[in-house]
A protein has these predicted regions:
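Functional beta-strand-loop-alpha-helix junction segments that form "active/interaction loops"
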Residues: 1-27, 32-53
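Mature extracellular/periplasmic domains of secretome proteins
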Residues: 18-20, 51-58, 79-88
Length: 171
């Protein structure tokens, strides 16, 4: 089950998180990191520092951040990703660089499909466990190759039939 919540401000965010019993929370919004400060997410054009929510929110074990610069490699450790870890998340998927909204949306859709179908089959039909890192890294590799294949087609290096064959092979 996927439940979508749009929040307008910090108090709504706190309420939604504290009333959430899901294993995964996905934040699909603008994000960033100030030059000398900390990472932030943007709600209704207002930057929210996750550190200001520490001790006020209940965080699910898995947090997915579909927002730019939520774990930047060129700034301090006060990133959005690290703040969610401090708030109680067991794992956080974040971006080190700016991301494109279309590709981020496709990635999130693939993640939701992979969780609901692949993970379910793997765990309950085959009775096998899988490490979260293996699950995510496999999906990320597949997403990378899919984007690369589409880029090759856009640049006229391969045709549509080759795109289909390569995507079938990769996925």
């Amino acid at each position: 089950n996927v439940e979508w919540k749009n929040v307008a401000d910090q108090s709504e965010l706190i309420d939604v998180l504290n009333n959430n019993n899901s294993a995964i929370a996905i934040f699909d919004m603008h994000g960033g990191h100030s030059d000398n400060g900390e990472g932030f997410l943007v709600l209704q054009n207002k930057a929210i520092n996750i550190s200001s929510l520490l001790g006020k929110i209940k965080i699910p074990p898995i947090v997915i951040l579909s927002a730019c610069d939520t774990s930047p490699i060129d700034n301090n450790h006060y990133s959005v990703a690290n703040m969610f870890l401090l708030a109680g998340a067991k794992t956080v998927l974040a971006s080190a660089l700016p991301i494109m909204s279309k590709q981020a949306s496709v990635y999130i859709a693939r993640l939701l499909i992979r969780v609901s179908i692949f993970l379910y089959i793997h765990l309950f039909k085959h009775n096998k466990s899988i490490r979260w890192s293996t699950f995510i890294s496999g999906m990320t590799k597949q997403s990378y190759y899919t984007e690369l294949i589409y880029k090759l087609q856009d640049c006229k290096i391969i045709n549509g039939k080759q795109n289909q064959e390569l995507n079938f092979f990769v996925n």
